[in-house]
């Protein structure tokens, strides 16, 4: 008799953990899907759509830090493509302020920021 309630509690705990894990993976999956959708839209030159998708991914609490930095960088490129240089520069500043940013991304962001600055002169 005692074993049945214990099994039931263990089963309930496992089910709760499984449901929590599934929701975590699902939220992360949705975030990465938004990021990829932004990339596809940018490739089709749908910059407004790309900006919306990148913004949705960036706002997600489940976005991995490296993907967030790339989403912000790519959003900056989309802003730059539609000549919203102030917003592009703000995004590039956010990218450059990201701790642990890989050097190649840092260099690309600095170069893009410099091009935007020169274009504004």
Language-model regions: role of each:
Residues 36, 74, 111-112:
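"A position-specific structural signal for the A-helix of alpha-solenoid helical repeats
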Residues 61, 98-100:
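Alpha-helical junction/boundary sensor with strong preference for TPR arrays
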Residues 16-33, 62:
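TPR-adjacent "capping" and linker segments in tetratricopeptide-repeat scaffold/adaptor proteins
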Residues 29, 67, 104-107:
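Structural signature of alpha-solenoid helical repeat junctions
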